[in-house]
Design a protein with these regions (language model features):
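A short glycine/serine-rich beta->alpha loop
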Residues: 46-54, 190-192, 235-241
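Catalytic-loop motifs flanking and including active-site residues across diverse enzymes
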Residues: 59, 199, 244-251, 294
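Non-catalytic terminal extensions of PLP-dependent enzymes
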Residues: 1-47, 65, 223, 228, ...
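Conserved PLP-enzyme active-site core in the AAT-like
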Residues: 28-31, 58-226, 234, 308, ...
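Short, flexible loop/turn elements at secondary-structure junctions
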Residues: 55, 136, 165, 189, ...
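Cysteine-centered functional microenvironments
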Residues: 18-21, 53, 133
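General small-molecule cofactor/ligand-binding pocket signal
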Residues: 50, 104-106, 325
Length: 402
């Protein structure tokens, strides 16, 4: 999270605004909204964007609502199914269910890419769309994306892009150029906004022009030499209070302007370089889930020494001062450990992480119990996560009573 983002976002000219002010008195904020939407459209190859969703999963739901409404207005009421790969992020099928549609799971190849034959078997005139992440959750580019696009067109389905892995594509290609009709982004994944703590977040949704009228209200437009707020009757409705999380959008806008068009194109290349540097450095210690070139993230399938689990490795990383990477996802990878270095990490930082991972691999062989009882240097040691998940204590009074 670049400090310049927080410097701009803490400016009283922005923090003292109220969304019920007259539009004439907040032209600067409306300009940020308008231009951020235009920048995101250019970056992704979409035609229009809404910045109103509060987070990535919220954006997912909005995109699916647009998909559903598009078919409904065409009188195509039987399109109630959405195809989701078995390697997808868990929010994909969850969002489909919340949107009132049915999930059709399609099998993946060993590298996580969509099995085309399996896809053909589930396509029909009841399918509303296909949800894909590209690169997929194993960090592998969906090489058959153009063939998938043609199949979607053939059956009248829309193509939906989960933007969680957009980092790998910046400056190289765009979802719109691959044939995607709807895109949702996670500003914390690609545009340097705060990542943790449960929010606030932002999950902008972009669409091709055929779907633009469905984007939720309110809209920010530029007409008659000024920025205006409009509520269009063709929209799917209003999906958030006012304009979403403005200060998060402002941080992303700052990041885009700071890098500029010339430097944004290096984001994808550096993210891919960093991930492959880690993969090549650790492949003799940890099993690589998919051999060969990965994109912005590398997925390992546990240690080559089987004495300890991926969970043990993650817990031991805490002792060395590292926040553990994602573990046990994707679900189709046994003992998965996903490392996703951003484009901003220096070689020195990457080398420090690599050496720590090598040290842990050696500890697993020489003293596996050290890992199985980790962490040792944190205030709270290993938690009983299974009980915590099954019997959560969510109220302070329950803690007192126990």
């Amino acid at each position: 999270n670049p400090k310049i983002n927080d410097f701009v976002a803490s400016n009283p000219s922005f923090t003292n605004l109220h969304p019920l002010q007259p539009a004439e008195s907040m032209q600067g904020a409306l300009e940020v909204y308008y231009k951020t939407a235009k920048y995101l459209a250019e970056i992704t190859g979409m035609d229009e964007f809404t910045l109103n969703p509060y987070a990535g999963a919220h954006g997912e739901l909005v995109g699916l609502m647009i998909m559903k409404e598009y078919h409904y207005r065409r009188g195509d009421y039987k399109r109630t199914k959405v195809i989701v790969p078995d390697s997808a992020h868990g929010t994909n099928p969850a969002s489909v269910n919340v949107a009132g549609m049915e999930v059709l799971e399609v099998a993946s190849n060993p590298d996580g890419t969509v099995n085309i034959e399996d896809l053909k078997a589930v396509l029909s005139d009841e399918v509303a769309g296909i949800m894909l992440t590209n690169p997929n959750t194993l960090g592998i580019f969906e090489k058959d994306i153009l063939a998938i696009k043609e199949l979607a067109r053939q059956y009248g389905a829309l193509l939906y892009y989960d933007g969680a892995n957009l980092n790998a594509l910046l400056g190289i290609t765009r979802p719109g150029d691959m044939g995607f009709d709807i895109v949702h982004l996670n500003l914390h994944k690609t545009f340097s906004t705060p990542h943790g703590g449960g929010g606030p977040g932002s999950g902008p949704v972009g669409v091709k022009k055929e779907l633009a009228e469905l984007l939720p209200n309110p809209r920010v437009v530029y007409e008659d030499g000024k920025y205006q707020i409009k509520y269009l009757p063709t929209a799917i409705g209003q999906i958030s209070n006012f304009f979403g999380n403005f200060l998060v959008v402002l941080r992303a806008y700052t990041y885009i302007l700071t890098l500029g068009k010339e430097n944004l194109k290096y984001v994808g290349k550096l993210a891919v370089l960093n991930a492959n540097y880690i993969k090549e450095s650790l492949k003799d210690y940890y099993q690589v889930a998919v051999p060969g070139l990965c994109k912005h993230e590398v997925v390992f399938s546990g240690l080559k020494s089987k004495a300890v689990s991926t969970l043990d490795v993650a817990k031991r990383l805490l002792d060395y001062g590292y926040h553990p990477p994602t573990i046990y996802f994707p679900l189709i990878v046994h003992e998965a450990l996903m490392v996703e270095p951003p484009e901003t990490e220096s070689k020195e930082i990457l080398d420090g992480f690599i050496e720590t991972m090598k040290t842990i691999a050696k500890e697993a062989i020489e003293n596996p119990e050290l890992l199985k009882t980790a962490p040792h240097n944190t205030v709270v040691r290993r938690l009983d996560e299974a009980t915590a998940a099954r019997k959560p204590i969510l109220k302070y009074q329950d803690i007192i009573n126990n």
